[in-house]
Every structure is written in structure tokens, then in C-alpha cells.
């Protein structure tokens, strides 16, 4: 006797097709789920996979999202601790790792996270050899370098979320002070995500009007208007949010979805993300730092050569030296 399904539906082809825009999120903590939800709300993926080592939490998050399927445009949401669930992903977002502690420098997190990545990265590449890896775990620049080394993927397909969020914070804070929307203030934070990030005051502008021409001292100690406080707030803001609510997640989730959209839709938009910078601005070591990168469906397509001041280049080199000082001592890469 035919089943209800057999009576209702006449199949015309065999089996489901491979997903075209599958996204996997590794780590279902606060940041991972903020990334997942932000990507779902932007309708970027035709399949979302979640991977974590904590099975109950993983299953619970998957079920919770599946129950909202009516309100989403992503037809398939799956999860498993086995990385085979991530097979055929276009983008894999890595948020796994030990959490940033209140008052802890991002750089102190490195060694605690490297050993975790030794298990994660080879598994991702095994099942999705053609994917673009987007690293979010902190300290993101060093861990993006670690991911590149462990993955064996070309450098343009290993990207760190970098200063995309720092720049967004900077644009928000500067725009608030100017009474305009953050999208109307153009400013870049480059270098290391976090403590030694580099504000490019020489390029800060509104509607093409360079702020440094209006105030030659902007961003310096000589500036009577103290605009440099905006960058100070960018550096301190993550620590402040962690102090207040215990973690940061929503802004980074939105930032990662923004990157995912550019990658999936082949938009060729420019984002400040962490990429291999050896040979640029006089940097001689293999380090990942944020520069303005043109992103498309192949990953980092190119890097924009910004006209930086000598001081800004010096700060960028200092960032590189700081990171290399840690990277050179890492084992088993």
C-alpha cells in the first residue's frame, strides 16, 4: 500500500543535489551562534552546518534553529561533532577556542588555542578542500596564521575576521561624534585586531573631505579636540563589553555575516581583514595582519595599497613584530 508521501509526491530526479552555498560554523558558543544567526538572517546559505564537541549543546542549538525554519530561507540546518557534517562547505567559520578572560590580552590566548586548532583544521580541509576558511577565534591574527600553516590551503583562502569589527566600531564612534550615520564616515583600522591596532587618521574622511586637512593634529597628542579617544575606545570597547555582559558576540556575528555575504555573492567589496602581509610595507616575516582586501568568491582577490604616513607604517611594522615574536616560538606547525 502506498504511503501518504508516495501518494502526495511524484519524484522526478534521484536524491538531493549538493549544496551550492553551504556554510559551516565550528563552535556553537556565544560568538558561533551569533555568526550562525546573522548568516541565516541575511539569507546567504542554502545549508548551515554546526560543529562542536559538546553534543547536548550542539543538538539543542540545531533543534532551536530548525524549529524556526518557517521564518528562514535556509532549507537545511544540520549539526554533528563529526566533521563529515561539514562536507562540501563553501565557507567555514571557525569560532572554536577557549574564551577570552576579563582583562586578558588577546595575545595570551595563543598557546591555549593552538592545540585545539591542530584537531579542527585538518578535519575541515579533509571534508571541504575547496572551502574558504574565515577565522574568528582570538587572538585572530596569530590563529589565522596557525590555520594557514595547518590547512595547507593557499593564503588567499585563509582569512581572519581581523579589524573588520574594529573599523566598524571606529566608524560608529566617529560618526556618533559627528552626528552622522556610521556608513557616511570613512575610516580604517588596520594591523592587529585589538591592542596594537592602527588607526589610519590620514585617510579619515566624510564625503571626500579629509579630516586631517581640517585638523592637521587629529589623532595625535597635540589634538585639542582629543579625537584619538575614539581609537582608544575602539581598543577598550571589547574589554568593556566583556566586563558588562561577560562576552562579546552580536557585533562580531554581524561583522562575519558581512564578510560571508561579500564572499558568497562575489561582490568584490573591500574589507579590512587579516591576510598574509609578508613583503608589504617593509614587513619581512610571515604574519597575518589586517589590510584593505578586495574579497570575492575566491577569497582575498587583492590588497589595496593605502597611502600611509611614516608613523602609520611604523605602527604596522610594530604590530607585525609583536605577532612574530609569538609565532616564532609556536611548536608543531
Curated annotation (Swiss-Prot):
What are the positions of the active site? Answer: 193
Full protein name: L-lactate dehydrogenase B chain
- Assembly information from the UniProt record: Homotetramer.
Tell me the route in metabolism or biology where this protein functions: Fermentation; pyruvate fermentation to lactate; (S)-lactate from pyruvate: step 1/1
Family statement drawn from the similarity comment of this UniProt entry: Belongs to the LDH/MDH superfamily. LDH family.
Q: Where, by residue number, does substrate bind?
A: 106, 138, 169, 248
The principal location of this protein is: cytoplasm
Lineage here is: Eukaryota, Metazoa, Chordata, Craniata, Vertebrata
Q: What is its EC number?
A: 1.1.1.27
CDD domains listed in its UniProt record: LDH_1
- What organism is this sequence from? Anguilla rostrata
Q: Which UniProt keywords apply?
A: Cytoplasm, NAD, Oxidoreductase
Amino acid at each position: 500500500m502506498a504511503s501518504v508521501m508516495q501518494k502526495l509526491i511524484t519524484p522526478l530526479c534521484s536524491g538531493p543535489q549538493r549544496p551550492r552555498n553551504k556554510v559551516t560554523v565550528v563552535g556553537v558558543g556565544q560568538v558561533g551562534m551569533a555568526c550562525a544567526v546573522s548568516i541565516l538572517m541575511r539569507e546567504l546559505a542554502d545549508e548551515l552546518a554546526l560543529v562542536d564537541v559538546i553534543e547536548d549543546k550542539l543538538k539543542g542549538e540545531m533543534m532551536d534553529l530548525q524549529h524556526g525554519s518557517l521564518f528562514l530561507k535556509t532549507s537545511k540546518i544540520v549539526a554533528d561533532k563529526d566533521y563529515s557534517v561539514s562536507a562540501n562547505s563553501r565557507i567555514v567559520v571557525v569560532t572554536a577556542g577557549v574564551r577570552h578572560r576579563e582583562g586578558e590580552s588577546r595575545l595570551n590566548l595563543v598557546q591555549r588555542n593552538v592545540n585545539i586548532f591542530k584537531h579542527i583544521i585538518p578535519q575541515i580541509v579533509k571534508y571541504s578542500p575547496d572551502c574558504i576558511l574565515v577565522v574568528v577565534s582570538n587572538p585572530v591574527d596569530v590563529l589565522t596564521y596557525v590555520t594557514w600553516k595547518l590547512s595547507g590551503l593557499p593564503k588567499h583562502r585563509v582569512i581572519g575576521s581581523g579589524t573588520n569589527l574594529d573599523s566598524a566600531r571606529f566608524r560608529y564612534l566617529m560618526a556618533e561624534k559627528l552626528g552622522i550615520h556610521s556608513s557616511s564616515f570613512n575610516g580604517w583600522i588596520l594591523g592587529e585586531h585589538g591592542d596594537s591596532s592602527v588607526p589610519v587618521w590620514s585617510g579619515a574622511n566624510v564625503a571626500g573631505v579629509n579630516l586631517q586637512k581640517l585638523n592637521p593634529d587629529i589623532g595625535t597628542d597635540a589634538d585639542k579636540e582629543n579625537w584619538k579617544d575614539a581609537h582608544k575606545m575602539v581598543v577598550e570597547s571589547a574589554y568593556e563589553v566583556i566586563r558588562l555582559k561577560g562576552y562579546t558576540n552580536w557585533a562580531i556575528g554581524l561583522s562575519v555575516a558581512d564578510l560571508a555575504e561579500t564572499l558568497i555573492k562575489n561582490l568584490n567589496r573591500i574589507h579590512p581583514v587579516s591576510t598574509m602581509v609578508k613583503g608589504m610595507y617593509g614587513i619581512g616575516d610571515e604574519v597575518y595582519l589586517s589590510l584593505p582586501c578586495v574579497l570575492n568568491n575566491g577569497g582575498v582577490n587583492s590588497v589595496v595599497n593605502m597611502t600611509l604616513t611614516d608613523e602609520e607604517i611604523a605602527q604596522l611594522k610594530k604590530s607585525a613584530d609583536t605577532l612574530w615574536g609569538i609565532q616564532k616560538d609556536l611548536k608543531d606547525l
